[in-house]
């Protein structure tokens, strides 16, 4: 099966004053359509930076990233942003919800950015809230919800533009074990429906939900398993 995400000899180095800090080194990775991959490794190993490369949130210092066969190095910043908006949904450990918007408003936001009409986006947002079991919380602010509920809102928001890929960075890191398990069950369901899911985690129990595990250490892929 042809990969839908491919990293070819990807390296990333950050400059801090006069010091160069290599974070990723010669990463080669292929992720197939409908795969569910967990990226594991110790703190500071480069997991989150790798996810940023996969999600086109940052550009590599060397090598190339391809999404659906498109070489991102050949795209402008505007084209990359458009690709992200259409193809990729992000879920973060800290939820990143707008505190002054209710659940419905937070889920609608990506559709506003993509200039979808008001009636269409409200209907879609309510459907997505139903998908994550929070339709009755549509009018509630993030401050009125538990951590698990806020993460489910974040997942609904990530699905707003019907992305092919869901990328999640430590999505259960701030949750209790029950809420974390509920979140992973949503990812499993989304994967079974045909979406490609990539999760960064340090938790073996969370990674056990995935089809493949990629191990990273000191900026290099050091192993993986099914």
Model-assigned labels for residue ranges:
Residues 213-226:
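H-loop (His-switch) and adjacent beta-strand-loop-beta switch element
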Residues 2-216:
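ABC family nucleotide-binding domain
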């Amino acid at each position: 099966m042809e990969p839908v995400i491919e990293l070819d000899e990807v390296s990333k180095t950050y400059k801090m004053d006069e010091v160069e800090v290599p974070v990723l080194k010669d990463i080669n990775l292929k992720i197939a359509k409908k795969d569910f991959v967990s990226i594991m490794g110790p703190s500071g190993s480069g997991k989150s930076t790798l996810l940023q490369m996969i999600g086109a949130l940052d550009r590599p210092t060397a090598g190339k990233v391809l999404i659906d066969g498109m070489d991102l190095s050949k795209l402008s910043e505007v084209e990359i942003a458009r690709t992200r908006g259409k193809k990729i949904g992000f879920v973060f450990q800290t939820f990143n919800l707008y505190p002054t918007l209710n659940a419905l408003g937070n889920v609608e936001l990506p559709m506003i950015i993509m200039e979808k009409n008001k009636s269409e986006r409200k209907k879609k947002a309510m459907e997505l809230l139903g998908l994550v079991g929070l339709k009755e919380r549509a009018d509630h602010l993030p401050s009125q919800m538990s951590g698990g509920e806020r993460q489910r809102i974040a997942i609904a928001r990530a699905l707003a533009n019907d992305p092919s890929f869901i990328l999640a960075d430590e999505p259960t890191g701030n949750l209790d074990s029950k809420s974390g398990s509920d979140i992973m069950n949503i990812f499993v369901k989304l994967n079974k429906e045909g979406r490609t899911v990539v999760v960064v985690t340090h938790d073996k129990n969370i990674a056990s939900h995935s089809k493949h595990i990629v191990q990273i250490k000191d900026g290099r892929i050091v192993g993986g398993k099914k």
